[in-house]
């Protein structure tokens, strides 16, 4: 969007007083009554509000779920992926449509909550979210989780590795999300997505174009410095590591440009460390794009906790300055589920008991990898417990609580590094149990750090810290008041 148009919107937003942004929850009359705030800060450090237009759906379905290139006339998997892609794009509002809606809200022509409440939204998880306006997804999150002070949604950029192209570019995502940050009164501030392959391809086409507003690095830097974003999102399972990408040469599905990634990522990390910009990375061994099909051990679990630890060992200047959230902390909920299955199998002498034992051993190795890396770099590496939606029985919830409490007792440093997140978990029936499950899994004296204090330290939200200063400037630019959660952050013990 051009600068003059953006300035006009800022003046208009300030002129109408942004009243809806000052008290957003009270305006959601169509939702259940807002309960009292908990006695601790609550930050959802890992969530999503994007829709189908932001994701290369066909490529994602091909590579992640079906592990096919999508090539070939008779490729049935590709046909199915294209159908899913078509349905998602058909139902999701286009970028221009939503941009016009957001601009009409910013200029006071439309009340966002009236528009939201007059539409029937299924809130049925991923599929419903994929077809909604992004603003509606944000308002739904606020209604489902009214206790949450700050939501930190992550954008996505997987096009280059998936051999497909989303309908919305990363730059368009950034511009649209800025409006949502303003309209929600600072309840949302996100991570801008970055893909090193996109930058490498851009540099090949425009070797002298780093200063262009179209440069991927320039887009994410501007997003953080000027547009209300608080960090950077990386998705290594697409086919890259934080360091040592030359070792991926020859792995199945890896782009031949992989050896060039290190220089691009080094530039990004240097900037993040200097400006105190946090990074969130998908670190769970899941959602990989074919690379794991290779037999070479170097191809396994790209972006693992160990590889992030190696980054700090190779670049000690990053320690304490470049903070990274290792997303999905080893899926400890699945480990609890598999442990119970193994106990049942051994008690009943089931024939699959040996297979379950091997699976449980592999699961515990993944959790151990997170713990070891976080122990080695306690001021740099964090992790979130997000998308833990498998805790669907009382027995499993108790097992998860037992496992987590024992884990934290054995590794006390985790209490200062684990953070709360929801990821995709958006169903109304699951919202309250999800929060309760997380609370039950941790000792009461660690609730404050887990739900807010650790995230505030990771993001740099306290008064005088870099992210806080950038957000204060962002609110001044748009002429809106500082959010209430500023005071809650400053009054929360560091943990």
PLM features per residue range, with description:
Residues 147-303:
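Active-site gating/metal-coordination segments in enzymes
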Residues 48-50, 235-237, 284-286, 330, ...:
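Catalytic metal-binding/acid-base residues of hydrolase active sites
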Residues 109-140, 165-180, 206-221, 254-268, ...:
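Well-ordered, non-membrane alpha-helical segments in soluble/globular domains
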Residues 3-41, 45, 57-116, 122, ...:
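Mid-to-C-terminal alpha-helical segments outside catalytic/metal-binding sites
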Residues 42-54, 280-284, 326:
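Histidine-centered catalytic micro-motifs
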Residues 43-45, 154, 191-193, 233, ...:
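Active-site neighborhood of phospho(di)ester-bond hydrolases with catalytic His/Asp-centered motifs
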Residues 139-146, 174-187, 218-228, 274, ...:
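Acidic (Asp/Glu)-rich catalytic clusters
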Residues 58, 65-67, 246-419:
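Catalytic pocket-lining loop regions of alpha/beta-barrel enzymes
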């Amino acid at each position: 969007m051009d600068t003059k148009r953006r300035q006009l919107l800022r003046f208009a937003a300030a002129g109408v007083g942004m009243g809806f942004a000052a008290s957003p929850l009270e305006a959601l009359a169509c939702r259940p009554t807002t309960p009292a705030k908990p006695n601790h800060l609550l930050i959802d450090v890992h969530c999503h509000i994007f829709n189908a237009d932001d994701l290369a759906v066909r490529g994602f379905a091909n590579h992640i779920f079906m592990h096919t290139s999508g090539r070939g006339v008779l490729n049935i998997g590709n046909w199915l992926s294209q159908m899913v892609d078509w349905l998602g794009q058909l139902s999701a509002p286009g970028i221009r449509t939503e941009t016009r809606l957001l601009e009409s809200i910013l200029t006071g022509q439309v009340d966002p909550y009236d528009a939201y409440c007059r539409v029937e939204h299924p809130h049925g998880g991923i599929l419903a979210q994929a077809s909604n306006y992004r603003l509606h997804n944000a308002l739904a999150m606020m209604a489902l989780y009214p206790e949450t002070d700050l939501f930190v949604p992550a954008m996505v950029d997987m096009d280059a590795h998936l051999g497909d192209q989303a309908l919305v570019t990363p730059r368009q995502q950034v511009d649209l999300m800025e409006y949502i940050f303003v309209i929600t009164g600072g309840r949302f501030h996100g991570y801008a997505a970055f893909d090193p392959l996109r930058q490498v391809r851009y540099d090949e086409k425009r070797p002298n174009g780093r200063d262009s507003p179209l440069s991927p690095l320039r887009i994410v830097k501007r997003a953080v410095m000027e547009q209300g974003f608080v960090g950077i999102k990386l998705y290594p399972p697409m086919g890259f590591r934080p360091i040592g990408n030359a070792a991926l040469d020859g792995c199945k599905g890896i782009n031949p440009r992989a050896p060039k990634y290190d220089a691009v990522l080094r530039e990004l990390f240097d900037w993040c460390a200097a400006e105190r910009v946090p990074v969130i990375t998908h670190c769970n061994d899941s959602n990989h794009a074919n690379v794991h099909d290779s037999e070479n051990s170097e191809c396994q679990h790209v972006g693992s906790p160990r590889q992030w630890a190696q980054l700090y060992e190779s670049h000690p200047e990053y320690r304490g300055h470049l903070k990274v959230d290792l997303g999905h902390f080893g899926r400890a909920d699945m480990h609890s589920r598999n442990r119970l299955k193994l106990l049942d199998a051994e008690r009943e002498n089931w024939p699959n008991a040996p297979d379950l034992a091997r699976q449980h051993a592999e699961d515990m190795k993944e959790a151990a990898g997170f713990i070891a890396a976080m122990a080695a770099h306690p001021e740099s590496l964090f992790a979130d417990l997000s998308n833990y939606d498998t805790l669907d029985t009382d027995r499993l919830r108790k097992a998860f609580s037992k496992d987590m409490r024992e884990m934290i007792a054995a590794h006390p440093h985790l209490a200062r590094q684990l953070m709360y997140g929801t990821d995709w978990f958006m169903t109304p029936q699951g919202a309250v149990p999800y929060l309760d499950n997380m609370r039950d899994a941790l000792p009461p004296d660690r609730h404050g750090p887990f739900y807010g204090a650790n995230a505030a330290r990771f993001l740099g939200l306290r008064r005088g810290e870099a992210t806080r200063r950038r957000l204060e400037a962002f609110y001044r630019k748009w002429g809106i008041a500082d959010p209430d959660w500023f005071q809650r952050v400053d009054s929360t013990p560091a943990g």
